[in-house]
C-alpha cells in the first residue's frame, strides 16, 4: 500500500464521521466533549481520527473532524473538515482558512 491510499482512507474516514454527525440534532452535538479521538488502522499504518466540538455561542456549535498520521519526531500529516450547526438546524461548512489550525 502507498501513502496516497492512506491519505484517501483518512479523507474517507473524515467524510463518513462528518456525515454521521450531520444527522444529529443541535442539542446532541452541543453536548459532545470538546475533544475525543480514536485510533484507526489502515494496512500497516495507524492514524488518529479526532472530533473537536467548539460551542461558539448559545446558538452555534462548530464540529471539526481531524485525521492525523504521525510519521516521526513531530512530523506527520493532518487533514480536517467541519461544519457549524445553528440551533435552528441550519448547517454551514467551516471556512477553509479557519480549518488551518486543525491541519
PLM region spans:
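Flexible, low-complexity segments enriched in proline/glycine/serine and punctuated by aromatic residues
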Residues: 1-103
